[in-house]
Amino acid sequence: GCSHRIGTPSTRLALPEITIGLFPDAGATWFLSQMPRHWAYFMAWTGCQLNAQDGLVVGLIDHLLDYTEQAAILECLTNEVWSADGEANKLRLSQILQNAASDAKDFPPSQLIAHEARIMAVMDQVLASEKPVSAFFTAVDDFADDKFLARAANGIKRGSPTTAHIIHE
């Protein structure tokens, strides 16, 4: 990982392993293990694309920065007197990014938050079942009425069953 994870209005995040038949690598596995369980399984089983606001929700992004702040941030970073103390530099960088943080009004809204109740209900039911992968495969049939959820459902429907089972293990 990195020390300061930044999202912009055009940020796109995904875990496409399900769609290409691979298993999540050590980095993805670590990040998934740090997330709330329902988000981790939903993301890994669907390969859904997330935006910066979603990244904040699942803990993959720390700061939202608008493009309009880029020049000012670069100037601030260039003019900063950095020390030999790595921890002090991290703290100072955090302060700079926090000061420049966007109020996110120009960012696309979180799709995860918009669909949280529905995703949580499905994931709670699926993860409590004896065969979670099969249960999720069936449960996503109910996602057809929503563009974001239908696209997410296609991830597992068209993805690798082997990868889905590896993700569950």
Residue ranges and their predicted role:
Residues G1-M43, V57-V58, I73-L77:
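CoA-thioester-processing core
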Residues S3, L13, L22, A40, ...:
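Homeobox/homeodomain signature
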Residues G21-F23, A40-W45, S134-F136, N154-R158:
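Short, functional N-terminal and low-complexity linear motifs
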Residues Q34-A88:
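Contiguous mid-protein beta-loop-alpha structural module that forms a pocket-lining wall or clamp
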Residues D66-G159:
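Amphipathic alpha-helical blocks and their helix-capping loop/short-beta junctions
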